[in-house]
A protein has these predicted regions:
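Structured beta-strand-rich core segments of catalytic domains in phosphoester-bond hydrolases
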Residues: 1-68
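Acidic carboxylate-rich catalytic motifs and surrounding loops in phosphoryl-/glycosyl-chemistry enzymes
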Residues: 35-37, 144-154, 190-194
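Short Gly/Pro-enriched turn/cap motifs at secondary-structure boundaries
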Residues: 11-14, 39-41, 165-169, 198-200
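Metal-dependent phosphoesterases centered on the DNase I-like endonuclease/exonuclease/phosphatase
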Residues: 3-6, 80-174
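Conserved beta strand-loop-helix elements of the APE1-like EEP
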Residues: 16-31, 153, 165-186, 212
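Surface polyanion/phosphate-binding segment centered on an Asp-His-Pro turn
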Residues: 191-213
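Surface-exposed cleft-lining segments at the edges of enzyme active sites
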Residues: 38-39, 63-81, 117-122
Length: 213
């Protein structure tokens, strides 16, 4: 129970496959919540929520997977990323620092892929997706928190359940925390909690944990 643990939340849910939330300690008020992303094609899916906390605008997002290149679902993904960049620009122009966190379903560079050659022609690695992620960073004047502190490290946040991918190190970095450049100097730590992936019936993702002072 969140309240018993000393937390509260705002959330946006849509059935089994989509949902986003922002959770904060009870002493940190969550205000001005906004659910949904202006410009997204699928308004029946819960993939974006915002709230203000601690003087910052916080976003939790879950970008569509895209499934396969040259399909309607891939087009929906690109449209969502375009809309996210537009929203990032609007938020970035405001007075509050911005943090956007979640599963973006894009690898930023080949360093974020265990074997780039294995993904040629697949989603998550295309120039269309990566270009839109960079556009979001630029539009919102955001930094990739993990890469800001670890420019050359190869660590992953997602591993397929099949073929022992986690234990073989066959992963992707597709989960991010993007922060306004104005607060990037306050990033003290940002790492991937791989031990959570070792549990019984784990998620195929591992948490990304960052400390901002």
């Amino acid at each position: 129970d969140l309240a018993a643990a000393g937390y509260h939340a705002v959330h946006h849910s849509a059935g089994r496959w989509a949902g986003v939330a922002i959770v904060a300690r009870q002493e940190l008020e969550l205000t001005e919540p906004v659910s949904g992303l202006p410009g997204e094609l699928r308004t029946d899916e819960a993939r974006w929520i915002e709230a203000t906390a601690g003087g910052m605008r916080i976003v939790s997002t879950y970008v569509p997977n895209g499934r396969a290149v040259d399909t309607p679902t891939f087009t929906e993904k690109l449209t969502f990323l375009d809309a996210a960049a537009q929203r990032a620009a609007l938020l970035g122009a405001g007075e509050q620092p911005v943090i956007i966190g979640g599963d973006l379903n894009v690898t930023r560079t080949d360093l974020d892929v265990y074997e780039p050659a294995a993904f040629i022609g697949s989603t998550h690695v295309t120039a269309d997706e990566r270009g839109r992620l960079e556009a979001m960073l630029e539009a919102g004047d955001l930094v990739d928190a993990y890469r800001h502190l670890h420019p050359d490290d190869q660590q992953f946040t997602w591993w397929d359940y099949r073929q022992g991918a986690f234990h073989r190190g066959l992963g992707l970095r597709i989960d991010y925390l993007l922060a306004s450049s104005s607060i990037a100097s306050g990033l003290e730590e940002c790492g991937i909690a791989r031990d959570f992936r070792k549990g019984r019936k784990p998620s195929d993702h591992a948490p990304l944990l960052c400390v901002l002072r």
